[in-house]
Each structure stands twice: as C-alpha cells, then as structure tokens.
C-alpha cells in the first residue's frame, strides 16, 4: 500500500503529470473474482472510481518481482527516508513524556486512520464515497504526512495491487516472500520512464488533480512544517526536553507505527486469517490487523467488494473508518457512499453550492 518512491518527488517533475488518459486505457471488469455475482460492483474502482485498467497499457512499468537484479540499484531516497525514521524512533525511550505519547497516538489516528485508511484508500483509490474539494484536499494532506508517500504514488501502487492481486504484476504479494510484501518491495530503484508510465496508467485521475499534484511536489515540506511545529510548541510551552519528545514521538515513532501497520495489511492479511469470500487471491481477514488498521484488516471482505465503504461485513468485524464515513454522511460532507455489496443504497444529500466547492 505504500509508494516505493515516497521521498523522490523531484524525480517526477519531468514525468508528465499533465498527461491525460485515453479511452483505450480503460475497460469494464477485471480485478479479483469472487464466488458471488458481484462483478458490476466488486470489480470496479481499480483504475479510477469508474473503471479498470487494461491488461495492456504502457509498455514500460516498474518491475515488481522479488529478484536479485532489483538489488543492483536501490532507491536511496526511500532507503534513507524509511531508515532515518526508524533510527530516529530509537531515541524515543530517552525522550519519553506522557504528552509525547498522547500526541503520537492522536497523530496515529489522524494520519493513519483519516489520512491513509479513509483518504488514500477508500476515497481516492476506490471512490467508496464522494466529498467536497476542501475535504478531499485535507484527507490527501493527512495521508501525505503519514510518511507513506504522496497520494499519486500510493494510489497507483494500490490500484495495481488490486488488478494483479497475488499474481504476476502485484507489487507486494507474499508469494514473493513475507518480508518482500511487508516492506522490501519499496526499495528497488525505478527509472523516470517507468514511474511516468506507472502513474499515467494507474492514477490518471490524480495526476490531473491540481491539489493532489501540489501535495505530491511538496511532500517533504509538510513533514518539515509538522516537525517544526511539534518541536516549537513543546519547547515554547514547556521546555526543550518536551519539544524534542514531541518531535520524536509525534513524528518518528508515530510514522514507524503507521508504516508497519499499513505494511501488515499487505503482508499478514494475505497470509493469515479467515475468509468470508472465495476470491482468486490470498486475501484474509485478520482481526488484530483489523483493529490496529482502523478496519483495513478485514482484507478478504475488501478484495471481494472493493468499492464497498464498509470493510467489516459481520457485526463483530469492527470498522472505525466506516463509522467516520457514516458520520461525514450524516452532516452532508459525504455522499454517494457505497454502503452495500450491490452499490449505493441511499440517495445522496441535497447538494448546495457550498458543499460542491
């Protein structure tokens, strides 16, 4: 679910973000097959919320098999980014404060739950609901400060994962190794040509979204601003030790937690757990990942019905992300919510000029 090039935004400046998508790049159908007759619903929202990608498309895309040739060239920006965050998190025991822990947990929900699970995944990748432009920008921003790459990177990789789930072409299948699926797939280097073809094919809607492109190009800026705010606030209102504590716990520790919980959806939820639906991939429902990842761990349910806003399909499969979507819908900030396995079951709220802004 995470981008392999989250910190290399400069490599995309010549990647053709203004390029459009041809009708030949889309078709109906595709994706993960299920035993139930849900093709019209369950197999949508891979290429964009209204269609799928073809088996053809650009000839050059990032390679994703776990092979020795990959390790000839590493994507050093990603290695340094992820490695540096983990090293910084090792300082956490020496700068522990209860307020730092509280900030860590709060930002874990804000960036991981609202940003990644709700924003990147259910809204931008699958179109499980619609919202206003300001809210869409906000969720994309929160997803970005999770540290998992820009929305363009993240969504492109995840849509490709659904199109080739646990088959040749899946960026992170455990069939290539558990650690590969968990995090090693992020590090091999890709050329600008490969990256441009990849994003054009799998995220053509987002590369034409000015707000999302802006967040992509300013990915690192938001982390610098957040880190400065945490350090400055703790230092100003308390002391230097508290400022450093807030920085380490609110940025580094929180990012490591969000990283690995997201990665567990890619790895553990394709290896262990139970299945409610007979799909053509290895997706599983894993209760503890479901709890840690705000409902994302009910992964077999999701692969069976990809656009469905609710990932928990049984009463005891808790899905906090869906609860937030329901809350947004109740106040008119979400509509066209895909509530059921057969599509949108409720009429959208009356639209006004304000919530269309």
Spans of model-derived segments:
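Catalytic glutamate of the conserved HExxH
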Residues: 109, 122, 267, 271, ...
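Non-catalytic, topology-defining segments of multipass membrane proteins
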Residues: 1-263, 308-357
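Short Pro-Cys-Gly-centered "Cys-loop" motif that presents a nucleophilic cysteine in a tight turn
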Residues: 3-7, 269-272, 294
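C-terminal accessory segments of proteins
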Residues: 258-276
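Short glycine- and Lys/Arg-enriched binding-loop motifs that mark or flank ligand-binding interfaces
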Residues: 111, 115, 269, 291-293
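Active-site-proximal inter-transmembrane loops
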Residues: 203-210, 272-298, 304-305
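Short amphipathic alpha-helical surface patches that serve as generic macromolecular interface elements
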Residues: 262-265, 285, 302, 321
């Amino acid at each position: 679910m995470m981008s392999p090039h989250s910190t290399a935004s400069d490599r995309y400046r010549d990647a053709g973000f203004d390029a459009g998508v041809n009708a030949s790049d889309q078709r109906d159908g595709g994706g993960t097959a299920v035993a139930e007759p849900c093709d019209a619903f369950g197999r949508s929202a891979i290429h964009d919320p209204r269609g799928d990608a073809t088996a053809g498309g650009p000839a050059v895309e990032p390679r994703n098999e776990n092979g020795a040739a990959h390790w000839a060239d590493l994507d050093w920006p990603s290695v340094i980014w992820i490695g540096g965050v983990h090293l910084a998190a090792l300082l956490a025991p020496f700068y522990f404060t209860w307020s730092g822990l509280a900030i860590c947990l709060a930002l874990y929900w804000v960036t991981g739950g609202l940003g990644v699970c709700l924003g990147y995944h259910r809204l931008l990748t699958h179109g499980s609901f619609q919202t206003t432009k300001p809210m869409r920008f906000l969720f994309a921003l929160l997803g970005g400060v999770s540290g998992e790459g820009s929305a363009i990177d993240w969504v492109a990789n995840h849509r490709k994962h659904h199109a080739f789930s646990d088959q040749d072409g899946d960026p992170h299948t455990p069939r290539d190794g558990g650690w590969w699926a968990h995090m090693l797939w992020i590090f091999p280097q890709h050329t600008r040509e490969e990256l441009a073809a990849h994003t054009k094919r799998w995220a053509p809607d987002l590369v034409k979204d000015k707000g999302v492109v802006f967040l992509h190009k300013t990915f690192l800026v938001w982390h610098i601003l957040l880190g400065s705010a945490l350090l400055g606030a703790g230092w100003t209102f308390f002391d230097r030790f508290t400022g450093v504590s807030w920085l380490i716990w609110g940025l580094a520790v929180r990012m490591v937690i969000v990283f690995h919980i997201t990665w567990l959806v890619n790895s553990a939820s394709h290896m262990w757990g139970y299945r409610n639906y007979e799909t053509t991939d290895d997706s599983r429902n894993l209760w503890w990942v479901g709890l840690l990842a705000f409902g994302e761990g009910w992964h077999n349910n999701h692969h069976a019905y990809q656009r469905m806003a609710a990932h928990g399909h049984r009463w005891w499969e808790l899905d906090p992300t869906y609860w937030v979507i329901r809350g947004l819908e109740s106040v008119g900030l979400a509509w066209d919510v895909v509530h059921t396995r057969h599509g949108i079951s409720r009429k959208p709220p009356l639209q006004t000029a304000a919530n269309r802004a």
